[in-house]
Amino acid sequence: MLKLFSAFRKDKIWDFDGGIHPPEMKTQSNGTPLRQVPLAPRFVIPLKQHIGAEGELCVSVGDRVLRGQALTRGRGRMLPVHAPTSGTVIAIAPHSTAHPSALAELSVIIDADGEDRWIEREGWSDYRAHSREALIERIHQYGVAGLGGAGFPTGVKLQGGGDKITTLIINAAECEPYITADDRLMQDCAAQIVEGIRILAHILQPREVLIGIEDNKPQAISMLRAVLADAHDISLRVIPTKYPSGGAKQLTQILTEKQVPHGGRSSDIGVLMQNVGTAYAVKRAVVDGEPITERVVTLTGEAVSRPGNVWARLGTPVRHLLNDAGFCPSADQMVIMGGPLMGFTLPWLDVPVVKITNCLLAPSVAEMGAPQEEKSCIRCSACADACPADLLPQQLYWFSKGQQHDKATAHHIADCIECGACAWVCPSNIPLVQYFRQEKAEINAIRLEEKRAAEAKARFEARQARLEREKAARLARHKSAAVQPAAKDQDAIAAALARVKEKQAQATQPVVIQAGSQPDNSAVIAAREARKAQARAKQAAHPMADSAIPGDDPSKAAVEAAIARAKARKQEQQAGSEPAEPVDPRKAAVEAAIARAKARKQEQQAGSEPVEAVDPRKAAVEAAIARAKARKQEQQTGSEPAEPIDPRKAAVEAAIARAKARKQEQQAGSEPAEPADPRKAAVAAAIARVQAKKAAQQQVVNED
């Protein structure tokens, strides 16, 4: 009994709320086998044919490409696209694509050369020898995406499933009217589809694999059962025909009774779903080594004379496919990409076929009926009864029309699958799906803007924080530099202080001259040279003009001379009580010679350098003082014995003094001399004469 219940549950199917039963209109195209379409002369390949960002271009204008060659690089969710045939890239520019508004997207335009040459293909016939990651990467790089209409990258979907997938569902329902692409593919390529399903099962390792197919496809069901006759790892489930049983959430509920939560994904309940066309593309990518360059497209409608299903190369213009099917357009002809409920009308026929294109419907005017005027909502709730997602379409309609985005979001407008069942049953002919699409687009735009604003705010706050940190660090560096200078600065400061102290010590140190020793006049000479340099610089900066020296008052000069004579007599009277320092006649002779040389040098410089004005009164006073000193020295010679003088040494020293005098005279022309003071020169000359007389007298005494 338990086995009976288990077997019953194994084949059990469930139902979902809502749904409709529109005319199927599938017999127009599912009766003829798949056929090839002649190559178009030009192909337009949009870079974005899937959910996610477009890939990075890896070709340029003028490049020759082969069929299957990658035109873009795929990283992350960026899925690459490949050349549908061999030819030359003539342009890379925006072109209108498969979109309700025919938006222009960046596309690669290729002129076919007619040879249709493939790249070198490397298939993995023994795919089980490769790792799960390698298989997923190959599927992704070969451009496989969901071919049921969503266009989600298959590799990303498999990678996101991970180890939590317990049920793999293959969607073969194909519930929308007119479309028979999957039906015909299952009839002609059932074995390849099953092989692709096994590759997916090998990657995911689920507990069960289910194929869901509607009961209005008897030929496809029989072909699958024939292929799965000896297989026990894949179960074929035939479900009643009901629209939209092919929806992902609806088919999951039919086969497993599980419902995907609001805002969630099927992987949250351990389910992953793939389309039969996707399974076939996986087989060709892994086993045959062929990127996705073509897909099955249904050409149907009363406006075409040869309806059916064809292998259409991606990038083929819609006009080329319809012309091959015998398209006979009327005056107000429309062409729908997709089905009559979920498709959209093309504004022109130069739009290319992409990976999500499963049908091109060209109905006649009678087939579609006359357009009806939109009326006001009567709140009949027919749309709510038909909604397979358990939503309230009439409320969403009012929220969308009134721009009440928050309320529309709260009523789960994101769960709308845009199946069109509500618009189909609406007695007021309200295009509800169009309102819902526009509302979802506006909500997405608002969220994107909020995200950008949040990112901009985060960047601004991060920048402000960085600037504050840099400012604090800069202030800290300045404070530390002010408190404690660097080692180099400390050394420089210490050296400067040492120099200042040394100069102060030199300035305050007295000059001591010891009798009988040669004084060190280097410091005095250096100071004199410095004063000379300052004087020359001052004269160069501020040249002075010669001016006449006015004469002094004669009465004042006479008074000063009398005062000088009185001082001289007083010094003569004191000569007897104070001992005088003995004078060396040799030194006196030398000093006299040096004084004469300086006098000659000063006379030579008198013509070139201005002479400081001499005060006659001071000169007379100094001369009187000099004579008094001379008399005092003469009086002292008789009281104290003098040191005996060697005449030969005196003669030698006199000769040396004369030689030095000549040398100084010779240097007078090349080196500028310090301006001499005439007063000092006169005093020095008088002292020299007195000392010379004293030396002569002393010599006579010694001879006697």
Swiss-Prot record:
Region (Disordered): 536-684
Highest taxon listed in the record's lineage: Bacteria
Cofactor(s) demanded: [4Fe-4S] cluster
GO molecular function: 4 iron, 4 sulfur cluster binding; electron transfer activity; metal ion binding
Positions annotated to bind [4Fe-4S] cluster 1: C377, C380, C383, C426
Membrane topology of this protein: Peripheral membrane protein
Biased composition (Low complexity): 556-565
Cofactor comment text: Binds 2 [4Fe-4S] clusters per subunit.
Domain 4Fe-4S ferredoxin-type: residue ranges: 368-397, 407-436
Official protein name in the record: Ion-translocating oxidoreductase complex subunit C
The organism of origin for this protein: Salmonella choleraesuis (strain SC-B67)
Upper taxonomic lineage: Bacteria, Pseudomonadati, Pseudomonadota, Gammaproteobacteria, Enterobacterales
Encoding gene, per UniProt annotation: rsxC
